[in-house]
Design a protein with these regions (language model features):
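Extracellular parallel beta-helix/beta-solenoid repeat domains
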Residues: 1-170
């Protein structure tokens, strides 16, 4: 059958604050917890995705979806500068392996607010299979290509972002 069970009574909260994430092969950090997740005041400069939401219950057995994530006041500086697509396709990469069934979302709520994105050559956000995603009040400089890609999201709010000194809504 290959079903995987996760004990949600043992889920932890995560506070990842005031860190420098650089010179790391692959991704900066892997997010996989059902509790409250707060990622704040960090500096990311990574060869792959700065933040990867993984959801593998078939190969790596890392974890299930997330429920309450706030990513705020971070600096994402030239992330995804490596050449491997295996390390992510966006700075914040949220692509569960579990496909959207049309009714149930894999991730619940993810807020990406008041961050700074500098010199990123790939999309800043790829969001898939999430009930609610908020991308607001971020500063974006020297972005090449699309800033956000989203699909199968119940609600996607994108507002009051500033790109190269202009207010934009992606």
């Amino acid at each position: 059958i290959c079903d995987v069970a996760e004990d949600l009574t043992k889920s932890c909260d995560l506070i990842f604050e005031n860190n420098r994430v650089l010179n790391n092969r692959a991704r900066g950090m892997l997010v996989a917890a059902k509790g409250k997740i707060r990622i704040k005041d960090n500096y990311f400069n990574t060869t792959g995705a700065a933040i990867l939401f993984e959801s593998d219950g078939k190969k790596w057995y890392e974890s299930g979806g997330t429920s309450d994530v706030v990513i705020s006041e971070n600096v994402f500086d030239n992330c995804l500068y490596g050449n491997s697509e295996n390390w992510g396709s966006s700075v914040i990469d949220m692509k569960p392996r579990e496909k959207f069934d049309g009714e149930h979302y894999y991730h619940s709520k993810v807020e990406i607010i008041n961050n700074k994105f500098y010199d990123n050559k790939k999309p800043l956000l790829y969001a898939d299979n999430a009930k609610e995603v908020v991308f607001s009040e971020n500063v974006i400089e020297n972005q090449v290509g699309k800033s956000a890609i989203y699909q199968n999201c119940g609600k996607f709010i994108c507002s009051d972002n500033k790109a190269d000194e202009k207010i934009i809504n992606l």
